[in-house]
Amino acid sequence: MRNYLNINAINKNDVLHLIQRALALKSGEQPKTKSITAVNLFFENSTRTHSSFQMAENQLNWKQIQIDPQTSSMTKGESLVDTLKTLKAIGVDVAVIRHSQNSWYENVLRSEGHAIPQLVNAGDGSGQHPSQSLLDLVTIYQEFGHFEGLKVRIIGDLAHSRVARSNAEILNKLGATVTFSGPKDWQPVDFDSFGEHVDLDVGWSEQDVVMFLRVQHERITHTENQNFSAKKYHEVYGLTESRYENLKENSIIMHPAPVNRDVEIADDLVEAPKSRIFDQMTNGVYARMAILEYVTE
């Protein structure tokens, strides 16, 4: 039994094994079913991640408990640690948690006393999104069969994106060349170690993967929201018809979703032939099945 909190804390061989396992499950291989009870605890809104984990748990024949933090004893002041100890005491084996606090799991892991369930990080603030990273890796590997030498451009709201951070680091480890584009004010300083920040159209036609990120209005400042122009952003940092036409023949378009149509990606291009956005969602179920098997081995 183990946790799944940060994909970059997992060794390369285990990451590749998880990718292969997800693809095997997708091709029809039978899952490793066990008598497991999981709780899904989401402190932030979610459609894809939440429902995808529920679907993965169903496919594994797990029992599920759904808890809304807004109607739980945490509104009375109970800590996350004590909530998890309570859930373990009543028989919960795995807790899938999304939280607005970066690295929420660090305080939990430092706790002493009664046991807690195995932990799966379903996203922590602007920190990490390890299950999204895995499904993105599955999607890229399914397309190209390798990572070494691939050119990947990550575009958009880098500062507030847990997806960008998780993906940039793991793709570097797997041998891809990562570059970034987007507003300079949304370029974290520590991203310099993962790749170069360039104007969007520089080297555009050489990219194998172009990964767009949602503008996270809920995390940017009030002033930034007031000054934001969707039309201007799309012209400078978005996937326009002309940029689509200038992509390599075998390149793919990705986005963790939800997509702001006509902001990050032109409406007509969200489901264009090069788009793998809905394939990512499909792969998310199998990637999360592989993760849930992994934490209960």
UniProtKB/Swiss-Prot annotation:
It holds the Pfam family OTCace. Keywords: Pyrimidine biosynthesis, Transferase. Heterododecamer (2C3:3R2) of six catalytic PyrB chains organized as two trimers (C3), and six regulatory PyrI chains organized as three dimers (R2). Carbamoyl phosphate binds at residues 48-49, 98, 129, 132, 257-258. This is Aspartate carbamoyltransferase catalytic subunit. PROSITE patterns: CARBAMOYLTRANSFERASE. GO terms for cellular component: cytosol. Belongs to the aspartate/ornithine carbamoyltransferase superfamily. ATCase family. It is an enzyme of class 2 (transferase). Signal peptide: none annotated. One of its GO terms (biological process) is 'de novo' pyrimidine nucleobase biosynthetic process. It comes from the Bacteria. Pathway: Pyrimidine metabolism; UMP biosynthesis via de novo pathway; (S)-dihydroorotate from bicarbonate: step 2/3. GO terms for molecular function: amino acid binding; aspartate carbamoyltransferase activity. The keyword Transferase applies. Its EC number is 2.1.3.2. L-aspartate binds at residues 76, 162, 214. Catalyzes the condensation of carbamoyl phosphate and aspartate to form carbamoyl aspartate and inorganic phosphate, the committed step in the de novo pyrimidine nucleotide biosynthesis pathway. It catalyses: carbamoyl phosphate + L-aspartate = N-carbamoyl-L-aspartate + phosphate + H(+).
